[in-house]
């Protein structure tokens, strides 16, 4: 059962796997109903997950492989009860995600899309935008991706880095903040790089956004659920 990852499917097929493609919920349910007794492995993504009732319907399931780092919708207790291995790709995409996070930050802070569109219209807008150099970057979640972002920010843009994590790290030179609010207060730019799931649900709320202030910039390369959408809309609409 795999979401569409067509470029890599031949690798699995050449390794001897018989693939059952189920990219939609209806196809997934049909595949489990039709082939449940023959399925040994499941390939999924964190937002799609794999649930207890689905695990129960696959009597010969041995492994659930999650593409990417997040596995918040995989029922770990159900897998553990059956001694089913659950794996993920933690850290594999960290460099490319970190590159993209800095690209988004540059694009946002320097207003590159709007400036590009303006030049293409033959305009020359004389607008001064902030620089990244020498600014304060707050990273919410200093895992593999957060570490890669911090490295690029320090070495590439001469930024100072602070972070908030579930626990302080003793192996980094960056300043630890005890809460997301404290981190936002100490930041010009704020990058969200946490896991998804219940533990981080709406972790970035009104209090964090208020602490970041109307001149702050925020980039979220984590799950959308980490930021309170209602609070974000309210902050934008009221220029806070």
Give residue spans per PLM region.
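N-terminal glycine-/charge-rich "phosphate-binding" loop or analogous flexible N-terminal tail
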Residues: 1-41
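Active-site regions of enzymes building and remodeling cell-envelope glycoconjugates
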Residues: 14-20, 83-84, 172-180
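Conserved beta-strand positions in the Rossmann-like core of class I SAM-dependent methyltransferases
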Residues: 20, 162, 225
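Short acidic/histidine-rich motifs immediately flanking catalytic phosphotransfer sites
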Residues: 33-41, 59-62, 185-190, 213-216
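Phosphate/diphosphate ligand-binding glycine-rich loop within oxidoreductases
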Residues: 38-116
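Rossmann-like adenosine-cofactor binding region
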Residues: 50-54, 166-240
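Phosphate-coordination loops involved in phosphoryl transfer and adenosine-cofactor binding
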Residues: 61, 133-137, 206, 215
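Phosphate-binding beta-alpha-beta segment of Rossmann-like dinucleotide-binding domains, i.e.
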Residues: 82-84, 89-136, 140, 144, ...
């Amino acid at each position: 059962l795999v979401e569409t990852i067509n470029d890599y499917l031949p690798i699995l097929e050449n390794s001897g796997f018989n693939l059952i493609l189920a990219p939609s919920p209806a196809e997934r349910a049909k595949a489990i109903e039709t082939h449940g007794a023959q399925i040994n492995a499941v390939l999924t993504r964190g937002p799609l997950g794999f649930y207890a009732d689905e695990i129960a319907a696959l009597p010969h399931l041995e492994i659930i492989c999650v593409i990417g780092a997040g596995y918040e919708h995989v029922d770990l207790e159900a897998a553990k009860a059956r001694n089913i291995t659950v794996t993920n790709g933690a850290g594999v995409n960290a460099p490319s995600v970190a590159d993209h996070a800095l690209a988004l930050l540059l694009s946002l802070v320097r207003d590159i899309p709007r400036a590009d569109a303006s030049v293409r219209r033959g305009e020359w807008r004389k607008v001064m935008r902030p620089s990244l150099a020498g600014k304060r970057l707050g990273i919410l979640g200093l895992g593999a991706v957060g570490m890669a972002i911090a490295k690029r920010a320090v070495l590439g843009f001469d930024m100072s880095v602070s972070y908030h994590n579930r626990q302080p790290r003793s192996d980094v030179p960056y300043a630890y903040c005890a809460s997301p609010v404290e981190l936002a207060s100490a930041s010009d730019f704020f990058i969200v790089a946490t896991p998804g799931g219940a533990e981080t649900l709406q972790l970035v709320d009104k209090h964090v956004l208020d602490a970041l202030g109307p001149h702050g910039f925020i980039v979220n390369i984590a799950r959308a659920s980490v930021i309170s959408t209602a609070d974000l809309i309210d902050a934008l609409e009221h220029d806070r």
